[in-house]
């Protein structure tokens, strides 16, 4: 029997009250669905991908906290997480992770066999990412691959194939993760250095703002390429221009060289994904 406090701890573990991660997974998946279908995708597939984004992001948070269980207690921002405080055990967290993965897999079973096969990659990347912080300064790239994996799955679900153009969207989404998760890592930089945890924020050092700016420029070029590949019109390119405006704002926030401002830039990034989605939707009406 799960008590009320335990239920709250499980919900806290999923960060369901902080939907930013869901948005960052969901928007690129919806870009891909709309582009693959050249308009509104079938409602059943749309619902599966929305629910899948919520469940797999939750699963990713659970396995992330499991991987960081020996570190979170020493970091100001994470010391109240359920595994760090002992509200939940390691065994309970692992069981919960596998239950969430089974729920997500149950959804995927309603799709074609190719998409089912690709879904195994999503689980593998979700498990791999949190452990990369100990081995490479580029864990953000692994996060990007995990968040972008819904893109080939979306094309597979709609077209039963993954054309090379889908991998362009995948690449842009991966670069986007380098942008927003580096800003996120700035907030934990001081604690991460003490604990020996690696990140792009540490790797880039004093040049973090300009390197994020470089990746933002790569993203904008990628968005322009996507527009050309899929024959999109000025409606889409208008959304790219608005996205560029958001990036200018993020650069302004990063210029303060303050963890709180960098975290605000991270949170604001989901508007980039949403405005691009709106541009694609309007263009494919």
From Swiss-Prot:
It is a multi-pass membrane protein. Pathway: Cofactor biosynthesis; ubiquinone biosynthesis. Pfam families: UbiA (PF01040). Its EC number is 2.5.1.39. CDD domains: PT_UbiA_COQ2 (cd13959). It catalyses: all-trans-octaprenyl diphosphate + 4-hydroxybenzoate = 4-hydroxy-3-(all-trans-octaprenyl)benzoate + diphosphate. It is found in: Cell inner membrane. It is an enzyme of class 2 (transferase). GO terms for cellular component: plasma membrane. The chain crosses the membrane at residues 20-37, 96-116, 138-158, 166-186, 211-231, 234-254, 262-282. Keywords: Cell inner membrane, Cell membrane, Magnesium, Membrane, Transferase, Transmembrane, Transmembrane helix, Ubiquinone biosynthesis. GO terms for molecular function: 4-hydroxybenzoate polyprenyltransferase activity. Its cofactor is Mg(2+). Coiled coil: none annotated. GO terms for biological process: ubiquinone biosynthetic process. PROSITE patterns: UBIA. PANTHER family: 4-HYDROXYBENZOATE POLYPRENYLTRANSFERASE, MITOCHONDRIAL, PRENYLTRANSFERASES. NCBIfam families: ubiA_proteo (TIGR01474). Catalyzes the prenylation of para-hydroxybenzoate (PHB) with an all-trans polyprenyl group. Mediates the second step in the final reaction sequence of ubiquinone-8 (UQ-8) biosynthesis, which is the condensation of the polyisoprenoid side chain with PHB, generating the first membrane-bound Q intermediate 3-octaprenyl-4-hydroxybenzoate. HAMAP family: UbiA. Belongs to the UbiA prenyltransferase family. This is 4-hydroxybenzoate octaprenyltransferase. It comes from Hydrogenovibrio crunogenus (strain DSM 25203 / XCL-2). The gene is ubiA.
